[in-house]
Amino acid sequence: MLYIEVLLLAIGLSMDSLAVSVTGGAVLKNNCTAGNIIKIASVLGIFQAGMTVIGYTMGLGFEKYICAFDHWIAFTLLLYLGGKMIYDSTKEEEEDGKFDPLCNRTLCGLGIATSIDALAVGISLAILKSPLLLQASTIGVVTFAISAFGVYFGNRFGKRIDLKLDLIGGLILIGIGTKILIEHLFFS
């Protein structure tokens, strides 16, 4: 696989992370520091690279088992997180339990949900006998960069438009989950 193909693959895999990071940036409002941008982008990048490695090591032998339910895992996680964001958007701003993109548990859930495709890609890369280190590191770095941009962009956009961005973000997460489910059920 040529490096340009690896780069395009990494960009494609990072699109769900971009959507999630834009939402996270919008929800952060005045708490969008460089450290918080790095935290969100790092978690999303590490999960993308890590799931690629896990998929690669699982290889062809387990592909049929993983493909049977990976879309349900992603859908369920994104439905839950999106639903929580929508529910939280109806509450008062001061209430505890508001969707927090900096919460480690939330970040891990988002990391898993947005990197399920990377697991399948890792399996495919094992079949192709592609060099794992190049693939996984490129996927992780590209996802980090795109996610960092997404958090920053989402934060700037969110400050300019006074909308219920957590409501919109929740709908986006549910939309991503639904897209993953439909693609796997009807188009794979």
From Swiss-Prot:
Transmembrane segments: 2-22, 40-60, 66-86, 107-127, 133-153, 167-187
Listed Pfam families: Mntp
GO molecular function, one term: manganese ion transmembrane transporter activity
Protein keywords: Cell inner membrane, Cell membrane, Ion transport, Manganese, Membrane, Transmembrane, Transmembrane helix, Transport
Subcellular location(s) of the protein: Cell inner membrane
Stated role: Probably functions as a manganese efflux pump.
HAMAP family: MntP_pump
Protein name (database record): Putative manganese efflux pump MntP
Species this protein is from: Parabacteroides distasonis (strain ATCC 8503 / DSM 20701 / CIP 104284 / JCM 5825 / NCTC 11152)
